[in-house]
UniProtKB/Swiss-Prot annotation:
<feature type="transmembrane region" description="Helical">
    <location>
        <begin position="290"/>
        <end position="310"/>
    </location>
</feature>
<keyword id="KW-0597">Phosphoprotein</keyword>
<feature type="compositionally biased region" description="Acidic residues">
    <location>
        <begin position="10"/>
        <end position="22"/>
    </location>
</feature>
<dbReference type="GO" id="GO:0005794">
    <property type="term" value="C:Golgi apparatus"/>
</dbReference>
<feature type="transmembrane region" description="Helical">
    <location>
        <begin position="249"/>
        <end position="269"/>
    </location>
</feature>
<keyword id="KW-0812">Transmembrane</keyword>
<feature type="modified residue" description="Phosphoserine">
    <location>
        <position position="60"/>
    </location>
</feature>
<dbReference type="GO" id="GO:0031267">
    <property type="term" value="F:small GTPase binding"/>
</dbReference>
<comment type="function">
    <text>Possible role in vesicle-mediated transport. May be involved in proper membrane localization of Rab GTPases.</text>
</comment>
<feature type="region of interest" description="Disordered">
    <location>
        <begin position="1"/>
        <end position="84"/>
    </location>
</feature>
<feature type="compositionally biased region" description="Polar residues">
    <location>
        <begin position="35"/>
        <end position="57"/>
    </location>
</feature>
<comment type="similarity">
    <text>Belongs to the YIP1 family.</text>
</comment>
<dbReference type="GO" id="GO:0016192">
    <property type="term" value="P:vesicle-mediated transport"/>
</dbReference>
<dbReference type="InterPro" id="IPR039765">
    <property type="entry name" value="Yip5/YIPF1/YIPF2"/>
</dbReference>
<dbReference type="Pfam" id="PF04893">
    <property type="entry name" value="Yip1"/>
</dbReference>
<feature type="transmembrane region" description="Helical">
    <location>
        <begin position="220"/>
        <end position="240"/>
    </location>
</feature>
<keyword id="KW-0472">Membrane</keyword>
Amino acid sequence: MPSNNSSFLDIDDDLEGVDDFGNEPNPFDDATVPDSPNMNNSTAGKGSEFYNTTGSKAESAPLQGQMDPPAYDQVIGQNDNDGLGRNGLRPGLINYYSKYFQIDLTQFKKRLSAVLTFRNDHNSESNEDNTDLYGAVWITATVVMINFTMSRGLNFIISDVIEGVKTGEDIDRASQFKKLLHSIWLFYGYTFGVPFITMQVLNRDEHSERNRSFKSVPELISVYGYANLIWIPVCVILNILDMSKRLRTVQAIQWAIVALGWAQSSYFLNSQISSNNNTETQSNGKFSLSIIVVVALHTLFCLLFRFIIF
């Protein structure tokens, strides 16, 4: 009789609910849950066996992917066995030109001092290709920024600081940005454009033995870039004199300073392009066609610098 009552209560209402799963077995009844080693019950034996097994594996083998952190001076991702150095970077345009910006500070200072002291040390360290474009980019950028900020800075110091007169409304911003644009195209165009012409002239010169053998155009660009170091003090002096440029005496001094910069930079270019062992040519006073073309282009550059910027 009780069984009939239980079957009478088992009514399917065609709705999904808890009563639909009342007669189904519990899937967790047959699951074996291991006990922790510290549990004091009858099932602790099997549980302790499970934990002892996993614990021994964890102690003997480290976690997958676990490694010590890199040292303080270690470059992440660097592999000492890949054989890739300054001349062995992986293919790619950025990697190709990035080697020209890997320069030692001592070597950079040595090249800067060689320009100012008329020494021929720029490319005489060794036969290894130590060409850099770092100097060509940043020395030229320094010259451009001096031409852009020097005049305004001097006016601010003299008028606003010393005399105490505000001259903010009298600034000729059009002439300042005009000088900036002219400095950019003139110096960067000369530094990175003329070496392509010079390279072609050097390759076609009949007296090529008088000239140094350049392996690539970036090597010539590096020479022209370091030659711009001479124009840093020249531009500083010219900007100071430019405040009184109406006087004829000041204009004559500006011409003399530009001529001095031309002479020193021309000498540096000549010393770098000419062969170091060419003592016979230097004693006879003869110059190759390449040197004549280089000096002529440099003279044109100095004239444009004098008339356009100052």
